[in-house]
Amino acid sequence: MNEERHATFDSFLSLDIRVGIIQKAEVFEKAKKPAYKLRIFFGDEIGFKNSSAQIRNYSVNELEGRRVIAVINFPPKQVANFISEVLVLGAVTEEGIQLLMVSDRAKPGDKVA
């Protein structure tokens, strides 16, 4: 039997998870795996952040203007010639990553709890 790993509530609280809106999406040609470069707006207080996301089962048109949920306090990560600043969250399925649904009432920058 595999030993389960348990997170603590404090470790969950250490994550800054926010609602954002994808302002721009483009194919990330230099990434090793198929990916998009995303420019995401997290409200006036946080502003814009970049993400490299392996969510290629969506078109650019489906991504731009879409609300997403992202962890915004991981350290920036260099992906090829691009700095990814946030991790966009989704469900891992047989068809690829399915972005989490966000209510239209949620505004950019709202915290996720």
Feature-to-residue mapping (PLM):
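Phosphate-backbone binding interfaces of nucleic-acid-interacting proteins
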Residues: 1-113
